[in-house]
A protein has these predicted regions:
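Hydrophobic core segments of beta-strands in well-ordered, beta-rich domains
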Residues: 96-97, 152-153, 196, 246-247, ...
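Surface loop/turn signatures of beta-propeller and other carbohydrate-active proteins
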Residues: 119-131, 175-178, 215-231, 256-295, ...
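Extended extracellular/luminal ectodomain segments enriched in beta-structured repeat modules
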Residues: 77-79, 87-95, 146-148, 188-195, ...
Length: 717
């Protein structure tokens, strides 16, 4: 051997040995049918690793292989721990994947050395929404080299996000390329808006706004790492001239998301607003982001106020704010911006609004009665709160919140009304009770601040009857003011009819079907409509998914509710409000015609992006009467006395030998009314852009039409 090569060979050998010595050491990857030598206590972790999402859990991703630790076993209220056998610390870093809830004291992965916790990590999610994805994190443990240690996964948390996901725990000498933590950017507020880049489907980041060092609001944001799909708008006009700091909890090393945020004098959404291809033209939807339940519907200062569950920073559910829009005619709406933002009590869940005409709350000013919002703050605990305004634009949360403490974790959605005979406020509140299931609690108050339980109405076991978002109101039967009944309904619009003495509701008819369609949920009615008007007007959440857009979901058209006598007792009727007639651009009619099978389409020349069709007919010898609106099919089956709306069936009996049908068609769905409003069938549907046709057809005989009219409609925008 050449002596000159010996040092080189020795160096090569030592280097090779060093590389081998530095190979990663897997502590646990949670594959297989058991936890092995790890010791579990309690119920949260079960007896073996999970293989992904557990029942009732959002999709879990980002874990390694087929298994992971998931403490959602038996839901968020289960607790327990999972402890590893002892191991020697032999590498500089301890790397792991972690996700789930964020609670530094009750929900964490712990490293213990000499029996003491020396490192701890928790998940990213604090409030409703968020993501179950696991992300890479690590600790520098070089100071403990050679010492014995154990790992302990602790779940002592209950309620929302009361669980942790952990996987792939590894010792390594290579620092993992984990995300940057608590990344900040300072901004001097000079313009009224911040534009935040959003990428639909991107991992959610926790974005927190601080003003002069004080935390203002935090949101889960699908922050675009590069080119955004759209821009969310944050109004910062209240803090002009102040020092703002934006903080993101985790960011990939290469993400530009925080750098892309910029100030502007006008919202970035002033571009093609309301002209987007899937924007409903007769259904309200927010400028940007997600909406669900209508909230706080009230008539105040000569305006209809529509508040709604809103995520201004994402296309999907989360970050619950109260959005706000107003209208003078129930048809044309102006969105004003969010009025209730998440706070230390939690995200802003559903509720109602009233005008406190007598200023019982003391929240009025200079003789102006306050509008009072009553809402659920869905933190831990989940409580009921109020906010007020004397101008219908600026709202102040009550300093004495909450006005009603948590009963159970499943209490929410207060609907409040004034009960004139007892001179008290009445609240109906959804409460999920152990062993009793869905209930509605009735509370009374002299001032909207102090509430006393008056009674409880039970739902029906193993059903969704009276599940969440209750509404409660009085209506005359057949318009007769001396024959009035109270209606209690839940989110799916099933309802009860009965009497109310100011404290207790006594149902005479229970679990009656409301709407008969699909994609309709959490309807609410307006309070404080003028006495000379006297209508009970309802709007529901219309579940119209609009993929590829910067907004998602919408509201139904406003509906007038009445109680009508039937052989089975009083029943609700649903009819579109008369104000919608103002949208008619032109009238096409074929009144008085008898149509036979094979006759030409009387509306073959009609075209419309949004359309209204009305028909009253005697079916005669016809087997079916068929309406086509922008490619959707509405069939009346004469023998079955049944309506079939794009394949969805609903009972529709003749009334005095006749049938009446009204159809509203839009870019995102249909709303169909039959039987003088006793049958209401909403149905999300997306027509082809080029199909703007209307067609009426008779199968197997003839039908006589007393009324047959089609109206192309103007846009509400």
């Amino acid at each position: 051997m050449n002596p000159r090569t010996l040092p080189f060979l020795i160096l090569t050998l030592l280097t090779t040995l060093a590389v081998r010595a530095a190979e990663d050491l897997v502590i646990a990857d949670f594959e297989g049918g058991s936890y092995g030598d790890w010791q579990a206590t309690g119920e949260a972790f079960g007896t073996a690793p999970a293989t992904g999402s557990l029942p009732g859990q959002m999709p879990v991703d980002g874990f390694n292989g087929k298994g992971l630790v998931n403490s959602f076993v038996k839901g968020d209220d289960s607790t327990g721990s999972l402890t590893s056998p002892a191991f020697a610390i032999q590498r500089k870093y301890l790397a792991f994947l972690i996700g789930g809830g964020r609670n530094e004291s009750k929900l964490n992965l712990q490293l213990l050395v000499d029996g003491k916790v020396v490192r701890s990590a928790t998940g990213p999610n604090l409030q409703a929404g968020g993501s179950e994805a696991l992300t890479q994190e690590s600790w520098d443990v070089s100071e403990f080299a050679g010492k014995m240690a154990t790992l302990r996964i602790v779940d002592d948390a209950r309620g929302g996000w009361g669980h942790l996901n952990v996987d792939h725990i590894v010792q390594t000498d290579r620092k993992p390329a984990g995300p940057r933590k608590d990344v900040t950017r300072a901004i001097k507020a000079r313009r009224p808006y911040l534009q935040i880049p959003i990428k639909n489907g991107a991992p959610k980041r926790v974005l927190t706004l601080f003003v002069d060092g004080q935390k203002i609001v935090r949101n889960d944001v699908e922050l675009a790492p590069g080119t955004p799909d759209w821009w969310a708008v944050m109004d910062i006009s209240a803090w002009k001239g102040k020092n703002l700091v934006l903080q993101v909890d985790t960011l990939p090393v290469d993400s530009q998301g925080l750098d892309l945020v910029y100030e502007s004098s006008i919202p970035a959404d002033q571009g093609p607003l309301y002209k987007e291809p899937l924007r409903g033209q007769i259904h309200f939807s927010p400028k940007r982001g997600w909406n669900n339940d209508p909230n706080g519907m009230v008539y105040y200062n000569n305006e209809y106020h529509l508040f709604f569950q809103h995520n201004p920073y994402g296309w999907s559910w989360g970050n619950m704010h109260w959005g706000h829009a107003v209208s003078r005619d129930l048809v044309h709406w102006k969105e004003l911006g969010d009025v209730l933002l998440p706070d230390d009590f939690g995200p802003m869940f559903s509720g109602s609004a009233v005008v406190d005409w007598k200023n019982t709350s003391g929240l009025g000013k200079d003789g102006r009665p306050p509008m009072v919002l009553i809402y659920t703050a869905a933190g831990d605990p989940t409580v009921q709160c109020i906010a007020s305004s004397t101008d219908g634009r600026t709202f102040t949360k009550y300093s004495g919140n909450p006005v009603l403490k948590q009963i159970t974790g499943g209490n929410r959605d207060p609907k409040v009304m004034w009960h004139e005979p007892t001179q008290r406020w009445v609240m109906v509140l959804y409460v999920e009770l152990p062993q009793r299931g869905h209930t509605v609690h009735f509370y009374t108050s002299p001032n909207l601040k102090d509430w006393t339980l008056a009674s409880i109405t039970d739902g029906i076991p193993k059903s969704n009857y009276l599940f969440e978002c209750p509404d409660f109101f009085e209506l005359p039967v057949d318009g007769k003011v001396d024959q009035r009944r109270w209606v209690l309904l839940g989110a799916n619009s099933e309802y009860a009819v009965g009497t109310f003495d100011g404290s207790r509701f006594t149902p005479e008819y229970s679990r009656l079907p409301g709407q008969r369609g699909q994609g309709f949920y959490a309807p609410q009615t307006f309070s404080d409509i003028r006495a000379e008007d006297g209508r009970r007007i309802q709007i529901g959440w219309f579940q119209t998914e609009t993929k590829g857009m910067s907004f998602n979901q919408s509201m139904t058209v406003p509906l007038e509710l009445r109680l009508a006598s039937t052989p089975s007792g009083p029943r609700l009727t649903f009819t579109p409000v008369r104000e919608l007639e103002r949208l008619r651009r032109k009238t096409f009619h074929a009144d008085g015609q008898t149509l036979h099978a094979g006759d030409p389409n009387p509306f073959r020349w009609v075209r419309g992006d949004a359309l209204e069709l009305r028909a009253e007919f005697e079916p005669g010898s016809a087997r079916e009467v068929v309406f086509h609106v922008r490619g959707a099919t509405v069939v009346y089956d004469v023998a079955k006395e049944e309506l079939v709306v794009n394949g969805h069936k609903a009972p529709a009996p003749l009334r005095n030998g006749k049938q009446s049908i009204t159809i509203y068609g839009d870019r995102t769905g249909l709303e169909v009314f039959a039987c003088d409003g006793l049958t209401y069938v909403p149905k999300p549907f997306q027509p082809r852009t080029e199909d703007q046709s209307v067609e009426v057809d008779v199968k197997g005989g003839s039908a006589k039409f007393q009324t047959l009219r089609a109206y192309p409609l103007r846009s509400i925008w």
